[in-house]
């Protein structure tokens, strides 16, 4: 069967284990599998262009070329991959062994083994036997069983089941001497070392067992042969089963079903599952008293800080936390392995301050408890995890620092430097030990890496290395300037100690020479004079200060406490953000302190900044800035007054200024942003959790008193109803009290309003059927899904049926049917269930509407279980919209909070085990029970379902629960007569139906007996019957429990410290497992309105602008419909300002008109809004400040005017430099670029115009309309001009050149260049695989197509909005979209450096060569840099010479797009983007789908490009190459495989180092080595340093991609995702997943 092409990474994973060694050992097996795949792939054809490419086929087609091109290094790598195949012997080797009388095991094909095993013949059975570890020959299972039966085993012999490590095992008697076989037996693990001898220890072959012992065994056990046969079958079956699981299921499937080996270990280990999962990342926690005390101190400080941020309270409760309680919690958690729910329920006495214990005093004994979210416990739990990870990191860094220091010490011979290094190392280790936060550890790490930069440690020979980029600090240090830096005075560490007042430093001694005189001694080739030496030394000192942990801690303290943030709108933002916009409340913030940010406000600011709608500035107020500078000067400058002291102080001031402004303050701003993001996410996560808590802590629907039968706790019978538009129809589902489906009814005509006779008859029939349906099943409540306004009519129709039933058949109606409630239920969760995998497993035969209705009814019966149902492996619960800003949270963050909430609430509610054993949907919360998890819960569930029911709690141990897990879980698992146990007469302990833990049963029994003795005035026996009688007595008479004075009773028993435990016992004896959840409440009118309309308080409010469609006109008013289906009423007087003069609205409007109105008022009960269209009202912003306004909100009109004035001046400047031309041609006009795009805006695709160029009088520009909003500009160079005067220059040249083509006049340009180009453009636009839309929109279409055809490689073409004039070929092979660029030329389409006259040929080539690496020669670094765009088209500017400009060698398109700027204005307004109901249901009247989205600035992941030049956005150009010109380079061009500038340089999507790169390859390793300039050299007109790096050195620091022309200062390290010293950032590497030769297929790295 055909399969999708897989990446090289996937192949490596399949062939190699962690050590790089192949996993599958049988070479024949690999060869056979390859043959099978080749045979299968012969018949593959492309079907509907969903093609499948096989890597092996492609490799065979170009095998000869590959062999010629493979370097020695690549061949060595391939040889390593095939290593396992070579370990088998050839037939000649086997013959040679036979000739030498050597016994051996000849490998068989895997398929032959399997066939022999299935046939059961002797040969097949023996193939699975093991070798005898003593004799060297095969040992049968029979021998092994005999050993076990008769104890005939040598004590010194190893176990028989130890696997052999070698393929050849030689018998001593046959082989002879050891030396004879030395050449045959080689240890396969020591590939490069000397051969090892085969059997270093010779053993004799077992001769057999004693006959007498065999006879005795036969008499005892029967025929041993029979036993052997059974065992052989069992072994074969087990082996086949293991193979079946691993071979027939994908690893993801096994992982999802918790069937991996690791899952099995978790199930078996007697430690709570969630603890095991946590410890996989944190490691085992320390359990000694010192460690627990140290951690509790740290957690106490962190917790106090968090509570202080919340104004000193938590949830409005002003309680204090006891540090000893934290230590006790850690002991219970880590030492005794108890989870939070258990501690909160059964260990209250040991950590009282962590709980709100107000409900547990004697005065509140009779009060019903409420469910509580134990937030403090969970905060401590999270801090505990942070502490363990911090401790783990510190230990790892300590080991690394020690190793690195020792290696550095061996390389340095200068005694002074050795002493300095030792001092620095000891200082770093000391700082590391006292570091208390991740940020402080980062500071220590920064200091260590500054003084001990990472070298090539741990890099194996021959391994690819990232080109190292030397920092200015390292250059200065190697030049010996560290000695000069040490002469400035105090060291960075001394300054830090002085600032933090930890240590008083000695007074500074002034030098006896000037700084310049001292610097002369260090002049060298790199630093040619004393000024250069001082500048370098000052840089070193400033960097050291900025990396000193104590200095950073001091500056951080001031900055984080006092820094302020201001926001203002950009020009686009001012247009887009109106009074109802998401960013309206943060549009103008003035100097808001960091500590005043609440909730998720900062996340909105961050989003606004990313979308270029807001400008954000951080600032340290002037008084605090002056204080900071003053403190630094005070402790760093000399107090001397001599000339020398003053000169040295001038140098020190420069150092401090550089340290603060160039390093520390930018670093602090970055930290402040990170801190605000972390805080905002934490608070948003808490709000998200609170929203979920409110849902799951709500109790089920309660039956009315008259409906209560013998089982008071039985859930109500529910008739669930889902509205349907006709296909599917209205659906009614009847659920019994266990949530199982009893009956289903479809009634499509029930809500019909037609007066047609036939329709009326169908409606009457449906009413009768619904009536009979309800009469037959007697529901307690009707659950109606609230999805749109039609549901209100459906509710009325159901009530009509109920009234008819009560009137016509009162005797047949059950109690309460005349008062039957119809309850609206939100359909958002049921819709998730309808489309989930679990619904397909639970209700496989039912339709989607039925599944949704089942979820509606079950949600009324048991909200907790219904929510937990969607918390399975699919995690559908994460799609439940609970918070308007939840999209800012990662899925893992959300699920962590979901798990926390579900664990807390589930254990307070408990689970009825016997009921769940009969109805598996009740088992869904089981994974959240204390001690369990998805793996242990699934195992327990299977065991309980097999048993059917359970009668004693302690029997849970027999169902796979270990002792520790049982202790955690037992109190929350309820054992009662339900499910199958309801019909059993077996005894059930009443205490098992309470929350009383088994460890407290004796206390409960003693209390019950004491009360019983008191009531009956006698002393009963202590036998079980008497105790049971006492428990029944107190349970039947709760009043007797309330008489107990708890304090006196505890004093009499001397158990004063058990008050909370006894309170729990009394409560549970009164009413076991009482439901503590909030009682069910029907939705309020407001809630019903928002559910049915699909609106929220934010999307519909008075003053909001909406669009309405006129449906009907009446005298004096127009009846309209909003997008949500709400009815809008527009009165005549509200239509316009002169409305009183309008006689009839019909004269002004007609049906179908779309109006833009403002909401005047809302009538929620009638689902109506009143609208107003008056122009004066539309301009009025009186509703703008109705919402809560931030205290720091101050609108700055002056700033706005400056923005507008700047934009106006830029336009004037363009017009000022515009020079008209004296050219007469129908296709030429004297207009600017903006005017040209405006002129072409309403023209057809392919229309063009020639205009003057902004480059001067020797150029023209051809502007071509590619698509709506996409225009390309092609430069035309004029030649043969006479430069006599301005008039001759304004005339057209004698020759016109575009790229390498020359034309005589504009007519020839049109005929030979433009017309063919337009023809090819229209061919592409009309091609069957062309898709309109942006890159992301096309990707979404592809994902949908991929979902429908998962086995195909789907692809399509689209317009490149980022690079006008090119097309994008997008395709998906597995999951992620990949992109390649196609150039548009008059000769055709250029793809991967090949020209194609028509698209079909291009497609055929692409399908055959989808995985081909780009093998052509690579251009120089400088030629590539000339083609790399330094600004996006939306920025309307070139990048200082190259960028988007055109080319003289081939010519370059330049492009701009309408998709930026004010063209986006207003897209956020009026509820844009609401194209449907939040629950996912369709709108009854349709709706609009307005919205806006924005991709990342450099959304070029996995992209290749072959353009035809430089598709830019400005009129400026450069002297060299365009995209993919003759000079090479470009995206996906010949930038691979060759060495450039001393290193092997890869291109974008090229082959970097020799293997394929699927559009995400690295930029090559070694690029720019040997001083060959970096990417972005000369960018922005400034020369970059010779150290490489993308735009490195421009403007004093390396520039990141997307920075302004490389000329502005960026981080000192630069590079895309790169850090100082070439380290990986974000844990995954830089450009294209490290500069190794593996293919990066969206698997981690990339841009």
From Swiss-Prot:
Keywords: Elongation factor, Nucleus, Protein biosynthesis, Repeat, Transcription, Transcription regulation. Sequence repeats lie at residues 1443-1444, 1452-1453, 1511-1512, 1522-1523, 1530-1531, 1547-1548, 1563-1564, 1574-1575, 1601-1602, 1615-1616, 1630-1631, 1646-1647. Residues 1443-1647 are annotated as: 12 X 2 AA repeats of [WG]-[GW] repeats. Expressed in shoot apical meristem, leaf primordia, vasculature of young leaves, inflorescence meristem, floral meristem, young floral organs, developing ovules and anthers. It is found in: Nucleus. One of its GO terms (biological process) is transcription elongation-coupled chromatin remodeling. Residues 1-209, 1429-1647 are annotated as: Disordered. Residues 103-114 have a biased composition (Basic residues). Residues 1462-1471, 1519-1532, 1539-1552, 1561-1579, 1588-1600 have a biased composition (Gly residues). SUPFAM superfamilies: Nucleic acid-binding proteins, Ribonuclease H-like, RuvA domain 2-like, SH2 domain, Tex N-terminal region-like. Residues 7-20, 31-67, 152-191 have a biased composition (Acidic residues). Its main location: nucleus. Residues 1103-1174 form the S1 motif domain. Signal peptide: none annotated. Belongs to the SPT6 family. Interacts (via N-terminus) with IWS1. Transcription elongation factor that enhances the transcription elongation by RNA polymerase II (RNAPII). Plays an important role in regulating embryo apical and basal patterning during early embryogenesis, partly through negative regulation of the transcription factors PHABULOSA and PHAVOLUTA. This is Transcription elongation factor SPT6 homolog. It comes from Arabidopsis thaliana (Mouse-ear cress).
């Amino acid at each position: 069967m055909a399969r999708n092409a897989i990446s090289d990474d996937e192949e490596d994973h399949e062939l190699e284990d962690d050590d790089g060694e192949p996993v599958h050992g049988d070479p024949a097996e690999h060869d056979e599998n390859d043959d099978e795949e080749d045979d299968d792939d012969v018949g593959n054809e492309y079907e509907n262009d969903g093609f499948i490419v096989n890597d092996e086929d492609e490799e065979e087609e170009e095998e000869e070329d590959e062999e010629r091109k493979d370097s020695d290094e690549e061949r060595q790598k391939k040889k390593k991959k095939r290593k396992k195949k070579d370990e088998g012997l050839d037939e000649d080797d086997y013959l040679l062994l036979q000739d030498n009388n050597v016994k051996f095991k000849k490998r068989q094909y895997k398929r032959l083994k399997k066939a022999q095993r299935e046939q059961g013949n002797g040969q097949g059975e023996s193939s699975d036997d093991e070798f005898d570890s003593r004799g060297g020959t095969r040992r049968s299972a029979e021998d092994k069983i005999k050993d076990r039966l008769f104890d005939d085993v040598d004590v010194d012999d190893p176990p028989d089941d130890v696997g052999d490590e070698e393929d050849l095992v030689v018998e001593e008697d046959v082989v002879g001497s050891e030396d004879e076989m030395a050449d045959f037996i080689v240890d396969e693990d020591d590939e490069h070392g000397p051969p090892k001898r085969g059997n270093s220890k010779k053993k004799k072959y077992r001769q057999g067992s004693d006959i007498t012992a065999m006879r005795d065994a036969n008499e005892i056990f029967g025929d041993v042969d029979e036993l052997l046969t059974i065992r052989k079958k069992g072994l074969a079956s087990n082996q086949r089963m293991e193979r079946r699981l691993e071979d027939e299921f994908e690893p993801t499937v096994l992982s999802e079903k918790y069937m991996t080996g690791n899952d099995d270990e978790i199930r078996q280990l007697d430690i709570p599952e969630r603890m095991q999962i946590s410890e996989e990342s944190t490691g085992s926690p320390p359990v000694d008293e010192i460690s627990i005390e140290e951690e509790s101190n740290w957690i106490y400080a962190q917790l106090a800080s968090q509570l202080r941020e919340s104004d000193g309270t938590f949830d409005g409760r002003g309680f204090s936390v006891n540090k000893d309680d934290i230590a006790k919690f850690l002991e219970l958690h880590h030492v005794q392995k108890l989870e939070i729910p258990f501690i909160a329920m059964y260990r209250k006495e040991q950590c009282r301050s962590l709980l709100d214990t107000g409900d547990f005093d004697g005065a509140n004994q009779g009060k019903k408890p409420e469910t509580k979210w134990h937030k403090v416990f969970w905060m401590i739990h999270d801090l505990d995890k942070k502490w363990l990870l911090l401790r783990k990191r510190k230990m790892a860094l300590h080991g690394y620092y020690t190793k690195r220091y020792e290696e550095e010490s061996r390389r340095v011979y200068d005694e002074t430097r050795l002493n300095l290094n030792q001092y620095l190392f000891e200082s770093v280790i000391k700082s590391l030990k006292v570091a208390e936060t991740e940020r402080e550890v980062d500071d220590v790490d920064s200091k260590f890496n500054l003084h001990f930069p990472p070298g090539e440690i741990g890099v194996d020979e021959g391994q690819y290395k990232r080109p190292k980029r030397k920092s200015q600090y390292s250059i200065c240090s190697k030049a010996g300037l560290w000695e000069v830096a040490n002469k400035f005075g105090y060291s960075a560490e001394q300054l830090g100690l002085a600032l933090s007042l930890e240590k008083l430093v000695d007074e500074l001694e002034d030098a006896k020479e000037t700084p310049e005189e001292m610097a002369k001694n260090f002049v060298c080739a790199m630093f040619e004079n004393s000024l250069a030496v001082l500048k370098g030394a000052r840089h070193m000192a400033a960097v050291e200060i900025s990396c000193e942990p104590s200095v950073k801690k001091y500056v951080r303290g001031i900055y984080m406490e006092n820094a302020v943030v201001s926001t203002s709108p950009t020009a686009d933002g001012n247009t887009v953000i109106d009074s109802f916009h998401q960013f309206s409340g943060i549009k103008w913030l003035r100097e808001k302190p960091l500590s005043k940010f609440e909730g998720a406000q900062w996340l909105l600011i961050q989003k606004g900044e990313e979308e270029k709608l807001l400008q954000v500035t951080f600032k340290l107020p002037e008084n605090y800035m002056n204080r900071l500078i003053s403190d630094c000067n005070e402790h760093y400058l000399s107090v001397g007054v001599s000339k020398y002291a003053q000169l040295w102080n001038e140098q020190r001031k420069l150092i401090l200024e550089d340290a603060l402004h160039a390093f520390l303050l930018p670093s602090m701003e970055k930290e402040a942003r990170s801190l605000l993001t972390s805080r905002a996410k934490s608070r948003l996560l808490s709000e998200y959790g609170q929203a979920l808590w409110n849902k799951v802590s709500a109790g089920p629907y309660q039956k009315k008193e008259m409906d209560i039968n013998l089982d008071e706790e039985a859930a109500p019978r529910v008739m669930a109803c889902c509205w349907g538009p006709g296909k599917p129809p209205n659906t009614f589902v009847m659920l019994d009290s266990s949530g199982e489906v009893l009956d289903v009814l479809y009634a499509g005509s029930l809500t019909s309003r037609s007066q047609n006779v036939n329709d009326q008859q169908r409606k009457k029939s449906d009413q009768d059927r619904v009536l009979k349906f309800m009469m037959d099943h007697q529901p307690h409540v009707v659950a109606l899904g609230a999805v749109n306004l039609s549901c209100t009519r459906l509710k009325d129709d159901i009530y009509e049926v109920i009234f008819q039933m009560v009137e016509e058949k009162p005797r047949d109606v059950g109690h309460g049917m005349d008062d039957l409630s119809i309850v609206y239920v939100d359909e958002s969760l049921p819709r998730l269930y309808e489309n989930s995998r679990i619904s397909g497993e639970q209700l496989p035969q039912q339709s989607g509407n039925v599944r949704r209705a089942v979820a509606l009814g079950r949600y009324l019966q048991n909200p907790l279980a219904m929510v937990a149902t969607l918390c399975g492996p699919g995690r559908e619960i994460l799609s439940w919209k609970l918070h308007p800003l939840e999209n800012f949270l990662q899925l893992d963050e959300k699920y962590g909070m979901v798990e926390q909430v579900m664990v807390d609430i589930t254990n307070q509610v408990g689970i009825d085990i016997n009921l769940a054993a009969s109805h598996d949907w009740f088992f869904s919360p089981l994974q959240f029970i204390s001690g369990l998890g998805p793996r242990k819960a699934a195992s327990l569930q299977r065991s309980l379902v097999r048993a059917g029911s359970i009668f004693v709690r302690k029997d849970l141990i027999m169902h796979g629960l270990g002792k520790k897990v049982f202790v955690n879980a037992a109190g929350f698992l309820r054992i009662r007569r339900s499910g199958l146990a309801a019909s059993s007469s077996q005894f059930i302990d009443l205490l098992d139906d309470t929350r009383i833990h088994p460890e407290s049963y004796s206390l409960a029994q003693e209390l019950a007996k004491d009360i019983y003795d008191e009531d009956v005035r006698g002393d009963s026996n202590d036998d079980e019957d008497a105790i049971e009688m006492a428990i029944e007595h107190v349970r039947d008479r709760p009043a007797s429990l309330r008489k107990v004075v708890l304090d006196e009773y505890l004093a009499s028993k001397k158990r004063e410290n058990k008050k909370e435990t006894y309170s729990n016992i009394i409560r549970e004896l009164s009413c076991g497992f009482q439901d503590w959840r909030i009682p069910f409440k029907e939705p309020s009118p407001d809630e019903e309105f928002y559910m049915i309309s699909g609106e929220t308080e934010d999307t519909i409010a008075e003053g909001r602008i909406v669009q309405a469609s006129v449906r009907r006109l009446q005298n004096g008013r127009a009846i309209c419909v909003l997008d949500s289906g709400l009815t809008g009423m527009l009165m005549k007087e509200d239509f316009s300002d002169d409305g009183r003069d309008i006689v009839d609205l019909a004269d002004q409007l007609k049906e179908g008109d779309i109006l833009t109105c403002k909401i005047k008022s809302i009538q929620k009960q009638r689902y109506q809004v009143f609208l107003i269209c008056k122009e004066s009202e539309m301009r009025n912003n009186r509703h703008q400040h109705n919402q809560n306004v931030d205290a720091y909100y101050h609108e700055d009109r002056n700033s706005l005017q400056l923005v507008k004035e700047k934009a106006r001046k830029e336009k004037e400047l363009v017009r000022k430099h515009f020079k008209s031309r004296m050219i007469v041609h129908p296709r030429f006009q004297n207009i600017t670029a903006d005017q040209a795009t405006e002129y072409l805006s309403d023209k057809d695709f392919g229309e063009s115009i020639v205009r003057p160029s902004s480059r001067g009088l020797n150029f023209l520009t051809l502007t071509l309309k590619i698509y709506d909003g996409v225009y390309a500009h092609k430069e035309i160079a004029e030649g043969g001009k006479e430069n006599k005067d301005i008039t001759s220059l304004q005339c057209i040249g004698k020759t016109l050149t575009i790229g390498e083509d020359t034309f005589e006049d504009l007519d020839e340009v049109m005929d030979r260049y433009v017309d063919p180009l337009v023809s090819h453009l229209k061919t592409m636009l009309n091609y069957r695989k062309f898709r309109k839309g942006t890159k992301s929109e096309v990707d979404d279409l592809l994902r949908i197509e991929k979902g429908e055809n998962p086995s195909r490689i789907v692809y399509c073409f689209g317009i490149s909005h980022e690079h006008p004039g090119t097309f994008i070929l997008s395709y998906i092979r597995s999951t992620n979209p990949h992109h390649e660029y196609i150039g548009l030329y008059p000769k055709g389409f250029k793809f991967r450096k090949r020209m194609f006259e028509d698209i079909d040929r291009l497609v055929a080539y692409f399908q055959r060569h989808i995985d081909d690496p780009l093998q052509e020669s690579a251009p120089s670094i400088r030629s590539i840099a000339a083609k790399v765009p330094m600004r996006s088209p939306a920025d309307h500017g070139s990048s200082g010479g190259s960028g988007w400009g055109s080319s003289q060698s081939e010519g370059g398109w330049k492009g701009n797009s309408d998709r930026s700027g004010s063209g986006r204005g207003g897209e956020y307004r009026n509820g844009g983007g609401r194209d449907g109901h939040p629950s996912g249901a369709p709108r009854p009247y349709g709706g609009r789908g307005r919205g806006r989205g924005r991709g990342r600035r450099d959304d070029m992941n996995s992209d290749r490009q072959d353009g035809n030049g430089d598709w830019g956005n400005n009129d400026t150009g450069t002297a060299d190459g365009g995209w993919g010109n003759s000079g090479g380079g470009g995206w996906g061009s010949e930038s691979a495989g060759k060495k450039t500038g001393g290193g092997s340089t890869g291109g974008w999507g090229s082959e970097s180092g020799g293997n394929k790169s699927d559009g995400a390859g690295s930029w090559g390793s070694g690029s720019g080595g040997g001083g060959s300039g970096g990417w972005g050299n000369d960018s922005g007109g400034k020369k970059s340093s010779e150290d490489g790096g993308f735009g490195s050195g421009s403007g004093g620091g390396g520039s990141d991609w997307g920075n302004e022309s490389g000329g502005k200062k960026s981080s000192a390290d630069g590079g895309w995702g790169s850090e100082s010293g070439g380290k990986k950032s974000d844990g995954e590497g830089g450009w294209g997943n490290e500069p190794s030769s593996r293919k990066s297929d969206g698997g981690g790295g990339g841009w």
